[in-house]
Amino acid sequence: CLNRVVAQDVLSKYNNPAGDNAAFDGYAIDSKDTNNLKKDKGRLFRIIGIVAAGDKPNKKKKQKFQTIEIMTGGLLPKGFDTIIPIEKINFYPNKKNPKFILIKEKIKKNDHVRFKGSDYRKNDLIIKKGTIIESNHILALKTLGIEKIKVKKIPNILFFSTGNEISN
């Protein structure tokens, strides 16, 4: 369908991403738990699980000073509002078998979070009628799971000249 003309507007059928999710591998926390932290005295946050992309997050109520490991694309569980990238994590007692992470400073809300519908909102215009389809349109269609769209029929054109008035 590359280089074909779109016959009708193509709209997003749903939000993409479908929910707030992690932009990086890391640990999700509630930023409010870091409000009173000072650099000289950190706070341990208990690791309570892991969320991978495609997992449905646990709906169990989060306790104060808890964290959950989260993979890129993993949906943010209820009660968590920010992601600390894995590269910035201090593990306790050690990296090989961590039970806690150590946080030594205030963390801003919504860091490294991709919000529901931040790429496409439900009913967003993806491709306008009359547009010639390019490769970036195909990426958007694939991202949204749209496999078929209506395109205009390729016209059959025949050129034929008569006479010698168009020659030298």
For each predicted feature, which ranges?
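Phosphate-interaction motifs
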Residues: 1-147
